[in-house]
Amino acid sequence: MDTSRKTLLGMAAMTPLAGTLLASKTRTTPAVDASAAARERIRERYFPDVILRNQDNKKFRFYEDILKDRVVTINFFFAKCEEICPLITSNLVKVQRLLGDRVGREIFMNSFTLKPEQDTPAALKAFAKMHGAGPGWNFFTGKPSDLELLRRSLGFTNPDARLDQDVNQHIGNIRYGNERLMLWAACPGQANAKYIAESIGWVIRND
């Protein structure tokens, strides 16, 4: 991996064993067993299987329904954000258009609210429509404690505790990865849309 594709903060342990999952699926080998064990440890540590609802009010479990065996993007936002969120969302719309029909088929885009008390499924649906988000991109809400657990588990935190408590100062990164291969990376949400799309394609090409 080149230096421009930095390993997901706090989740670097995912990367070293990624290649072992390319081993044959037809028989059990020590390498496959080790990879399966590593994947399970990562799931237990970083991917709490909390229950969420999307903009269509459909129920999802974070790991089983959103991450497992998929190539995904992850970011955090809130609908009434007037600063960084609209810019990142608009940029992700460009990314989705560049990826075309692979979104919803090979790649799944996921945005999680930082203000679940305000962002109901209906509010998320209106936000998605306003920004032109297409199929294959889900916007999630849920219990405040579950969203906070998710934010911290995924490393969307600021090392400055004071800033971390201010939702208006939230991290504007995008995480992307291939859960099955344990390949994870991150980039700024306002990075060039073509660069983001190509970076996401990188974790697919390694599948």
What are the roles of these predicted feature ranges?
Residues 1-3, 7-25:
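N-terminal export signals
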Residues 64-84:
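Short active-site neighborhood of thiol/selenol oxidoreductases, capturing the structured segment around
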Residues 89-110:
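Conserved helix-turn-beta segment immediately C-terminal to the redox Cys motif
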Residues 22-49:
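N-proximal helix/coil linker or "cap" segments that precede and/or mark the start of modular domains
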Residues 163-207:
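Thiol-/selenol-based redox modules, centered on thioredoxin-like
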Residues 51-71:
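A short beta-strand-turn-helix
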Residues 106-119, 136-145:
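Thiol-based oxidoreductase modules, predominantly thioredoxin-like and allied folds used
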Residues 126-171:
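Short, internal strand/loop/helix patches
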